Amino acid sequence: MKSFLSSCTTGGCGAKIGPGELSKVLSGLPVFQDPQLLVGFDASDDAAVYQINEDTAIVSTVDFFTPMVEDPRIFGRIAAANALSDVYAMGGSPLFALNLVCYPEREDIQDLGEILAGGAEKLQEAGAVLCGGHSIYDREPKYGLAVTGRLNPRQIWKNNTPQPGDRLILTKPLGVGIVMAALRGEMAEAAAVEAALASMQRLNKYAAEKARDFPIHACTDITGFGLLAHTREMAGGSTTIVLYPSALPYIAQAYTYAQGYLLTAAGQRNRNFMEGAVEFGDTPFPLQELMLDPQTSGGLLLSVPGDCAQEALRAIQEAEPQAALIGEVVSRQALPILLR
């Protein structure tokens, strides 16, 4: 079998259409009105939320991509964890999922079985049910899930409702995109790959469960648009988010790779999108790249009231030891993001 990495031009969330291009396309779509639709695509949120009754709403999301690793079972786990993450980012719990499969006709079908087995493992871990799916032949393998979850409509974690005085908690380290780029170039150290794979395979379920014990004003997961673009979405039009680059958790080797200008195309698209929205000033170039790096199955970014942020951080660190306070929310300034 030709290797996954050699058969794919890109992989993971680095394959996403850039945020600038995507927003242009979506702006041409009609606005759908339904009083039961609590969250739609107009907010660029992580999932759709549709109210069923006073106490129940359905969370719906879909995510798929090409492989970023050679091991098909690990790829399946990562893709499933990434798809499930959107439900956790909304404050919900996954109920069931459908497989989405694109697979080359000439490739070994046993490897597809391994991909699906890896995805099923993560669904079982999440307590969700696999109900079926859809498959087609394609030139490159692709896998993901359409996931349905539930939540209380009074407890939705939206991505753009932070409040001045909040502190920001990031639950996973940055840098997996850069490490995967190094892996493709056969330059990655084993420890870096191990750290990246462990992070991408880990469900955001555990951080979300800890966070539910605290008032969460806003939440999103960090994926292909990188920390800065997702933070820009969180700031919305009424607040500014101040980030502390020196406090960021990241995979150590990713900093070194960025220092050597081992970059990703998606990261540079993210940089272009952020032009005029942030001033890097004297922020070291490697930290800039880590904030722009496309994450696959990245961590949650939680906006928590300042008076309980430290307590929330300690609780989340029981599940995610590398979680860190990385910023704060202030009233709107000239730019949506400031670096301090």
Curated annotation (Swiss-Prot):
It catalyses: hydrogenselenide + ATP + H2O = selenophosphate + AMP + phosphate + 2 H(+). GO terms for molecular function: ATP binding; magnesium ion binding; selenide, water dikinase activity. Binds 1 Mg(2+) ion per monomer. ATP binds at residues 16, 43-45, 63, 86, 133-135. One of its GO terms (cellular component) is cytoplasm. It is an enzyme of class 2 (transferase). The record marks 16 as: Important for catalytic activity. InterPro entries: PurM-like_C_dom, PurM-like_C_sf, PurM-like_N, PurM-like_N_sf, SelD_I, SPS/SelD. The keyword Protein transport does not apply. Its cofactor is Mg(2+). Pfam families: AIRS, AIRS_C. Belongs to the selenophosphate synthase 1 family. Class I subfamily. Mg(2+) binds at residues 46, 86, 221. Homodimer. One of its GO terms (biological process) is selenocysteine biosynthetic process. It comes from the Bacteria. Signal peptide: none annotated. The active site is at 13. Keywords: ATP-binding, Kinase, Magnesium, Metal-binding, Nucleotide-binding, Selenium, Transferase. Synthesizes selenophosphate from selenide and ATP. This is Selenide, water dikinase. Its EC number is 2.7.9.3.
